[in-house]
Swiss-Prot record:
Source organism phylogeny: Eukaryota, Viridiplantae, Streptophyta, Embryophyta, Tracheophyta
Gene transcribed to yield this protein: AHL22
Protein name (database record): AT-hook motif nuclear-localized protein 22
The species this protein was found in: Arabidopsis thaliana (Mouse-ear cress)
Functional description taken from the UniProt entry: Transcription factor that specifically binds AT-rich DNA sequences related to the nuclear matrix attachment regions (MARs). Binds an AT-rich DNA sequences in the FLOWERING LOCUS T (FT) promoter. Acts redundantly with AHL18, AHL27 and AHL29 in the regulation of flowering and regulation of the hypocotyl elongation. Plays a role in both photo- and skotomorphogenesis. Acts as a chromatin remodeling factor that modifies the architecture of FLOWERING LOCUS T (FT) chromatin by modulating both H3 acetylation and methylation leading to the regulation of FT expression during flowering induction.
Annotated region of DNA binding: 89-101
This protein's GO CC annotations: nucleus
Broad class of the protein's primary localization: nucleus
Length: 317
């Protein structure tokens, strides 16, 4: 084998036939550098991946799973706890609708004897007005207080005061039709005294004259007569003026009533009732002795003479 054949370069790839030997060498060197750089990159990426996997603790995955499950369970328990709090929490303030809650109606089983009842009375044509009201008071057993009236009447008999001082009153019979201007009075059923019943009327004539007085005879209605009145069940008969003894008795009775009311409200016993009776007897004998036992509110409402108030000094305790 000659020297020429021994000096030939090693075999080469067919894809490098078009390259110059110098360029071929550079191309091979570049490929080697690229392959070496690719190996380095692969090694670096693998090292980073291993380092990252090493940095991540497996326990963290389990704890993270637990943490992820814990909020869910916490949400459920929180929801349950919230529901329990909503059920067991005591409401504060006024209940809804309690302010506007309808109150039960007040039912009065019977009327009070001292209550006033209003009446509108219509007297038919041709009837006696005074007689009709008197019969109504007697049958209903109620006192009647006439407030006003309107309509027309005929053939009126009234009593007028004397025009001359000291002279007797005169009775006047009025014939014809008269318009009622004013009507007032009261009617009490028996056994009330007759003086407690009476009717006063003022009339206007056809020519403009005005006449009035106390009705002492028939008062015939000329057409419907409407009367506005009030009725009552009880009436206390008082004789005025009051005497001094009566005033003292009424004062003692008022104090005794206040004491009775306080004892009744406090649930007094029979012993308290006897004590109150003894106090009433003592008050009747010596009116000045009850001053020391009165509270200030009663002292303000009771009017006493000077000698009764300053009669005896307050005893020392």
């Amino acid at each position: 084998m000659d020297q020429v054949s021994r000096s030939l370069p090693p075999p080469f790839l067919s894809r490098d036939l078009h390259l110059h030997p110098h360029h071929q060498f550079q191309h091979q060197q570049q490929q080697q550098q690229q392959n070496h750089g690719h190996d380095i990159d692969q090694h670096r990426i693998g090292g980073l991946k291993r380092d990252r996997d090493a940095d991540i603790d497996p326990n963290e995955h389990s704890s993270a799973g637990k943490d992820q499950s814990t909020p869910g369970s916490g949400g459920e328990s929180g929801g349950g706890g919230g529901g329990d709090n909503h059920i067991t929490r005591r409401p504060r303030g006024r209940p809804a609708g309690s302010k506007n809650k309808p109150k039960p109606p007040i039912i009065i089983t019977r009327d009070s004897a001292n209550a006033l009842k209003s009446h509108v009375m219509e007297v038919a044509n041709g009837c006696d007005v005074m007689e009709s009201v008197t019969v109504f008071a007697r049958r209903r057993q109620r006192g009647i207080c006439v407030l006003s009236g309107n309509g027309a009447v005929t053939n009126v008999t009234i009593r007028q005061p004397a025009s001359v001082p000291g002279g007797g009153s005169s009775v006047v019979n009025l014939h014809g039709r008269f318009e009622i201007l004013s009507l007032s009075g009261s009617f009490l059923p028996p056994p009330a005294p007759p003086a407690a019943s009476g009717l006063t009327i003022y009339l206007a004539g056809g020519q403009g004259q005005v006449v009035g007085g106390s009705v002492v005879g028939p008062l015939m209605a000329s057409g419907p007569v409407v009367i506005m009145a009030a009725s009552f069940g009880n009436a206390a008969y008082e004789r005025l003026p009051l005497e001094e003894d009566d005033q003292e008795e009424q004062t003692a009775g008022a104090v005794a009533n206040n004491i009775d009311g306080n004892a009744t409200m406090g649930g007094g016993t029979q012993t308290q009732t006897q004590t109150q009776q003894q106090q009433q007897q003592q008050l009747m004998q010596d009116p000045t002795s009850f001053i020391q036992g009165l509270p200030p509110n009663l002292m303000n409402s009771v009017q006493l003479p000077a000698e009764a108030y300053w009669g005896t000094p307050r005893p020392s305790f």
